């Protein structure tokens, strides 16, 4: 089955019984609706499972100079999950969770962080050493049409990648690009800057995590909806419901909403829990020591 934007558009038209040759909804319109429903309906539904879908982290080396850090730009809801400090640069087993404070609490604690606007502020001062990991839920990339990506067909190790067609106009020398996997959940495996781009070739100094069949896209774009494959039918149905609403088809809208509700109910057991045989265990978190802020 084709899960690229091209395939999703075809599935939506079949489910909504929309003729292929109609002019009411263009492919661009349908992709816009896919992105709206993905971010506004499907992502919140998946997050409500509370099974750490989309969880990732940014890692920042500490040197005693940085007291404030921007919340990652691609964090869903512009919020974070937690912050941990790895006190060893070589052993990830030595870490502590940094407590979140409010401005009214800072005088009662020897150290932590608080949120001010879109920034994370360390208190009482910068941390001298270690690796700070900011865990957050990453927003799925924007679904784009086939005119904005190319498929890797040949890899010249640590030199370049060659695509099956010429690179699209949005990918040029110096462009920020993403390499997207061709297997679900279609993660972005590499975020990098394109070297010299010529026809179907992109020069890259590191190709270690790229495979034939992966997709080359502009930054924060993807041929796919970057969600579990089992939730793709929900996304398709939600777009169908939106179409019925736009067309003023009251009967179709009501039927579509009932179908979506049933599909969502059936789907919930597929995405949660993510581990069936082992319940979550709650343990005492590692605690910070005062020396971290000395």
Each language-model region and where it sits:
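Short, structured beta-strand/loop micro-motifs enriched in basic residues and often containing a Trp
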Residues: 156-162, 198-199
């Amino acid at each position: 089955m084709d899960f690229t934007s091209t395939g999703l558009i075809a599935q939506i038209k079949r489910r909504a019984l929309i003729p292929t040759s109609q002019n009411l909804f263009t492919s661009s319109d349908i992709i816009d609706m896919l992105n709206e429903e993905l971010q506004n309906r499907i992502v919140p539904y998946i997050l409500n499972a509370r099974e750490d879908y989309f969880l990732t982290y940014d890692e920042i080396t500490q040197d005693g100079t940085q007291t404030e850090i921007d919340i990652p730009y691609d964090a869903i809801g512009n919020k974070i999950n937690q912050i941990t400090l790895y006190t060893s640069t070589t052993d990830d087993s030595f870490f502590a969770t940094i407590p979140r404070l409010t401005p009214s609490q800072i005088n009662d604690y020897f150290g932590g962080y608080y949120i001010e606007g879109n920034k994370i502020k360390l208190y009482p001062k910068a941390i001298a050493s270690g690796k700070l990991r900011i865990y957050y839920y990453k927003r799925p990339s924007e679904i784009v049409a086939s005119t904005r990506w190319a498929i890797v067909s040949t890899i010249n190790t640590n030199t370049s990648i060659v695509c099956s067609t010429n690179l699209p106009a949005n990918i040029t020398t110096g462009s920020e690009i993403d390499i997207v996997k061709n297997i679900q959940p279609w993660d972005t495996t590499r975020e990098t800057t394109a070297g010299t781009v010529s026809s179907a070739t992109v020069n890259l100094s590191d190709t270690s995590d790229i495979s034939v069949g992966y997709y080359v896209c502009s930054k924060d774009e993807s041929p796919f909806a970057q969600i579990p494959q089992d939730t793709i039918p929900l996304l398709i149905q939600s777009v169908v419901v939106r179409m019925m609403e736009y067309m003023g088809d009251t009967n179709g809208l009501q039927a579509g909403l009932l179908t979506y509700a049933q599909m969502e109910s059936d789907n919930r057991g597929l995405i949660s829990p993510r581990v069936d045989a082992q319940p979550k265990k709650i343990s005492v978190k590692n605690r910070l020591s005062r020396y971290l802020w000395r």
